[in-house]
């Protein structure tokens, strides 16, 4: 049974309190939640109202949650407040780790739990808007979302196959089922009295329009939180991203903030101001910067790249230090193109962005092989070059855009440290010193579940690198090849003994560039692209 919408009077969109709005959510509804980490486009007031209502009344019950992008703060925000037994029975997320209380329910087998690649998930919502049954893609082949492996299922109570193997013209693809949502929680900055909405204070658009269309076209209720409402037909048409006829309920929250923390709107990350070139932004010389510096060596002039969250995200700052940041374009899967990537939970809140696409279109570009290079952080690597990030140490993190990005990028640069768990290093006199070794080996013999398939990458002719603070590897048909080591480390003691398998040692094994280890600009000149 579809939810009942409140009526419009004289064309005006109903304006309700958040508490009144969530009363329209019936039991068993499928709720799709917009938002990214750090409070980006998160309808926090609506989420809080729903969580509070369930605490007080134990209704609505047995909701299904769809969350394409990881929203939250890696603690108690995002969709974590909805992690109440009986409120949620089923979840399909692109990323799980930003709202860990939902992940906890999945790990404890208390909810049915699926993970689609983030880009695939937003594309299935677009398919749901068009009343298409799903999408067909080769994104995810050879990884844990492949039905020949785990099929995107995250725990033992998740049984139904949402992903199927299909064949067209003798080519294998994955079919991802589209799930049509009944309720949407979306957010904008301003709307008029008919629901037409603009995003002037926001840092991106994500897939707000796709979600609204999917819910509207399937007879559901689109609930939109905004900071203010204005007279009808007074918003500039080129600024309107959500047409009013898609919106069923508006919740006005004058205290709505751009990001978590309640700070005033940052006009640099909203794209209104441009940071002057003289503004100093730099990283201290540590293992994080060391990896970012070495990763920059894989960039070429004119390239279009992607940078992911984690240790890889310092590459933009390093390029700015070296004066070559304008010689290539870095993108983020959530939509930003160009500029300086932010770090931490609000990843994607870029400064000096050149353009912002909707997230679904950004992933179309990625899936089609548009990226020349990508920089992604890794959790674990095995002897076949497979990489794991979506689940480790028993914790469900989810893939985010990792699978979408790494599947077709012409060059893939994985960034991380060789070990984890209290690793401490220092860089002195142009050398790397391991002060305290990490407790956990990250290069293991076999991955239990695969987020990136080395085999598929080789079949597609992709160039794969693994960059750590003390060693650089490349992927070939016979496995990982060690091609560089840091000055100051011992090959056997500091590298080979800290891996569960022995890589092929390149006969041309060399030291990593000495400039990486000096606390001054490297004088790096970006190479021309090969033709």
Predicted feature locations:
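Conserved phosphate- and dinucleotide-binding cores of soluble alpha/beta proteins
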Residues: 2-5, 9-23, 38-54, 66, ...
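Glycine-rich phosphate/ribose-binding loops and adjacent secondary-structure elements
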Residues: 22, 61, 281-284, 293-300, ...
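Short glycine-rich or small-residue beta-strand-to-loop segments that form or flank ligand, phosphate
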Residues: 30-35, 64-67
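Short glycine-rich phosphate-binding loop at a beta-alpha junction
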Residues: 31-33, 304-308
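Short, well-ordered beta-to-alpha junction loops that form the rim of enzyme active sites
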Residues: 36, 189, 309-311
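Beta-solenoid repeat scaffold
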Residues: 50-63, 328
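Glycine-rich phosphate/diphosphate-binding loops and the adjacent beta-loop-alpha structural elements
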Residues: 196, 274-287, 294-306, 479-480, ...
